[in-house]
Amino acid sequence: MKDIEDLIEKAVELQSNGLISAQIADELNISRETVTWLLTRSKKEEATPAPKDISVDWSSIGKSAKRLHNISLALCDMVLETMEKVNAEVDVVVGIAANGVPLASMMAYELDADFAIYHRKGQGIVHAGHRGTISRNFGSVAGKNCIIVDDVITTGSTSMEVIEQLKEMDAKPRVVTVLVDKKGVDTIYNVPIQSLVRIARVD
C-alpha cells in the first residue's frame, strides 16, 4: 500500500506544479486512467478498485548518461535485427518528446542516422485533427526509413499518432523501440514493436 500512497503523493505534487493528467501520466509512466484514479482517490475510499496498470520507474537509468548509452546500444541491436529482416537501412531516428529523446539521440549517433523529435500536441489530449509535429529544427523524415523511440508503451496511442503522422509525411516507419511495453502487442499499424521488457498481467 505504501507504493500506492507514494504514487498518489507524486501525482498530487505534479498536479500542484501545474501539470495536466496526460503530463502526469507521462512523468509517472502510467495510464491517464490511473492518474485520474490517483488524483480522485480519497484515503477513506478503499472500496474503489484501482485500474489495472503498472507504474514504471526508470529513473535509475535516466539519471546516468552512461546507463542511457548502454541501454541505447541494446535498443540499436534490436533495431538492426529488425531492419535486416526487411533489408533496409536506418535513415532517421525519431524520439518522442520528452522521454524518448535522450535514447533516440544516442541511438542516432550509434546508427550514424539523422535525428528527429516528435512533439505531442496538448501532451496527449486528443482533439479531432489536432496532433503533434516533427520539429523542423532537426532531421527531415520525408521519404526516409524511420525508427520511433519512446520510453514506455502504455496504450499505444502515442505510437499510433507518430506512425500516422510519419506516413502522412511520406516517411517509412520501420520499427517502434521502447524500454518497456505494457500493451503487449507485436505490431502497431503493421510496424513491429521492439522492447527490452514486455509486461504481461496475469489476473
UniProtKB/Swiss-Prot annotation:
GO molecular function terms noted in the UniProt entry: DNA binding; orotate phosphoribosyltransferase activity
Gene3D superfamilies for the chain: 3.40.50.2020
UniProt xrefs under HAMAP family: GfcR (MF_01214)
Name of the featured protein: Transcriptional regulator GfcR 2
Recorded domain comment: Contains an N-terminal DNA-binding winged helix-turn-helix domain and a C-terminal regulatory domain (or effector binding domain) resembling phosphoribosyltransferase (PRT) domain.
Pfam families per UniProt: Pribosyltran
One GO term of the biological process aspect: pyrimidine nucleobase biosynthetic process
Top-rank taxon, per record: Archaea
Family: Belongs to the purine/pyrimidine phosphoribosyltransferase family. GfcR subfamily.
Organism this protein belongs to: Methanosarcina acetivorans (strain ATCC 35395 / DSM 2834 / JCM 12185 / C2A)
Keyword presence, Transcription: yes
Keyword annotations of the record: DNA-binding, Transcription, Transcription regulation
